[in-house]
Amino acid sequence: VIGGDECNINEHRFLVALYDGLSGTFLCGG
């Protein structure tokens, strides 16, 4: 997960801009 707590998909899943399925990482837009 990139961005730490800012990327917490449980609390800020609406801020997740992109999900890279190839590397399994979340890219946050917020």
Swiss-Prot record:
GO terms for cellular component: extracellular region. Glycosylated. Expressed by the venom gland. Keywords: Blood coagulation cascade activating toxin, Fibrinogenolytic toxin, Glycoprotein, Hemostasis impairing toxin, Hydrolase, Protease, Secreted, Serine protease, Toxin. GO terms for biological process: proteolysis. It is an enzyme of class 3 (hydrolase). It is found in: Secreted. GO terms for molecular function: serine-type peptidase activity; toxin activity. The keyword Transmembrane does not apply. It catalyses: Selective cleavage of Arg-|-Xaa bond in fibrinogen, to form fibrin, and release fibrinopeptide A. The specificity of further degradation of fibrinogen varies with species origin of the enzyme. Its main location: secreted. It comes from the Eukaryota. Residues 1-30 form the Peptidase S1 domain. Its EC number is 3.4.21.74. Belongs to the peptidase S1 family. Snake venom subfamily. Thrombin-like snake venom serine protease that specifically hydrolyzes the Aalpha chain of fibrinogen (FGA). Exhibits strong N-p-tosyl-L-arginine methyl esterase activity, and hydrolyzes tripeptide nitroanilide derivatives weakly or not at all. Monomer. This is Thrombin-like enzyme LMR-47. It comes from Lachesis muta rhombeata (Bushmaster).
